[in-house]
Amino acid sequence: ENPWLKLGLDENGYPLYILKSFEIATKLAPHIKLVYNQNSGMQTQMWEKIKNTILYVRSKGFRVDAIGWQAHILLANSTKEIAENPNQELKKLANLIDWAHQHKLGFHVTELDYFIQDTSELKKGHKNQALIYKKLIKVLKDKAKNGLVTLNLWDLSIRTKKGKVGEFHSIYDANFKPTPAYNVIKKALKK
């Protein structure tokens, strides 16, 4: 449940907490980039709603400088498709980045990590993670030719989530040795 929705909606059905956030930030943080950051997968209907919300926020005279995607891959059902159908889902991401650039917005992939439920299969999990990261970075590098695109990691090693079996993995293992995902990112940066 989103408690912020208890603040209500405006006359056009847009959440007041979002409008108020961008109104305050536009006024009080003129030198800070304002990012509409979303945690989910590439569900078309959801992103259409977000795009419409961004355009609406801007129509009110408030700044939105970029879209952010919190890329917690396999965190929930909403991000499973990225691992199961990466080509299809990353095509949606590419289209979303194109839309952002067409509307003079930067695009940030934030909080990138990869959930491995069965930690007895780390080698397989790390291989799959590296494959997804390689495809993701290819899209990001291609789209960076047309506008601002950034990538950051949620953490550097492993973390767990209370009540959830498995681990979130980044670019180093439990002993801080590079994982295959590290090598994918390093190679991409050298090109």
State what each model feature region is.
Residues 1-24, 29-36, 42:
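Active-site acidic/histidine proton-transfer and metal-coordination neighborhood
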Residues 1-12, 80-108, 113-191:
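Aromatic-rich peripheral "rim/lid" segments of glycoside hydrolase catalytic domains that contact
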Residues 18-22, 62-73, 140, 177-190:
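Short, surface-exposed, charge-dense and proline/glycine-enriched linear segments
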Residues 28-40, 50-86, 101-115:
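Aromatic- and acid-rich polysaccharide-binding/catalytic face
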Residues 45-46, 76, 118-120:
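Short Asp/Glu-rich motifs
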